[in-house]
Amino acid sequence: MAQIKLTPEELRSSAQKYTAGSQQVTEVLNLLTQEQAVIDENWDGSTFDSFEAQFNELSPKITEFAQLLEDINQQLLKVADIIEQTDADIASQISG
């Protein structure tokens, strides 16, 4: 049987940290994409083409990671809600 030692409030606090992490990852990717455009305007040749191909290959993986962090946020929020609801259900069964 699972044992959760965190309160719903603590789970929600953790969930917010995952959202913040997702936003930070997205912001970094956006900044690097802008920087990539600056480099692109000033660097021609096959070396840059290889560099750009690598960047373009990795960018979607970073976007997927940001989405994963958002998904974890949603899962933690659901768990917090379930814990609260279960606690309320048990309390109502006991009291009456």
Curated annotation (Swiss-Prot):
InterPro entries: ESAT-6-like_sf, T7SS_ESAT-6-like. Pfam families: WXG100. Belongs to the WXG100 family. sagEsxA-like subfamily. Homodimer. This is ESAT-6-like protein SAG1039. It comes from Streptococcus agalactiae serotype V (strain ATCC BAA-611 / 2603 V/R). The lineage of its organism: Bacteria, Bacillati, Bacillota, Bacilli, Lactobacillales.
